[in-house]
Amino acid sequence: MKNIIYIAIMAMWLMACSHEPEAASIPFSTVTAEKEVTLTADKDAPSCKVTLNVACAKGDQPEIDKNMNQAIVQELFDMEGLSIQQAADSFATRYTQEYKKNLAPLYAQDKSDSEKRAWYEYHYTIDTHTQSGHDGAIVYLADVDYYEGGAHGIKQQIVLNFNAKTGERMTLKDVFVPGYEVRLSELLLEKLMKQANVSSIEELRAKNYLYAIDMYPSDNFILGDDEITFIYNIYEIAPYSVGKTEISLSYSDVEDLLK
């Protein structure tokens, strides 16, 4: 009889544990902001369009949501003390206002040159999504695409990793032991050379990598389930023609450096 009671109690305990919410199960909703303005009142005038789709933490623990959302506002919009909706609306308004203010005088001079019209067709887009990361972390990814004149637009990926239990942003210093920089840079360089199929730094530079900079651990990284992926956007370690560079190291590769 005692065994039956014990088994029943254990079964109830296991069922209760299985219904506890997972750390990385914080729900998100999408905040949107859109704004478009034309440079002049002319029918065929160039325009600037801002489209922002930003994931916002909407869990049942306000302090965790606040920590995450404040970090998102700071990183994506360089603002403080605003909700994500307020920051997105403010950014869209300010961006389009500055577009008209700064470019209207220039366009007045170039208006007669049809070949230059495309230079004034601006856009700024942010799309975001989240995914579960290593050891219950929440990985927040923002894809930014903008054009502000010139030969081509710019695409960037911005990553934030959050401790799901606190909502605090996780940095490299939270992941690695003090003094990690030198060895981690060496591992990243080795992996980059392998990806580029070269055996020397000279060959790597011949492929336009690290032409005027030494290898370094990017603070733009993804704490994946099985590996850490370091993101280097265009112009950070290579020119536009090379594009975004991703370097992934397994946790076993950096085992001695992990906290």
Residue ranges and their predicted role:
Residues 13-16:
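C-terminal motif of bacterial Sec signal peptides marking the signal peptidase cleavage site
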Residues 2-8:
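Sec-dependent signal peptide recognition
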Residues 9-10, 236:
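Exposed boundary/loop context
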Residues 18-259:
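Compositionally biased intrinsically disordered regions enriched in Thr/Gly
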Residues 8-9, 169:
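A ubiquitous, low-specificity "background" feature that marks scattered single residues
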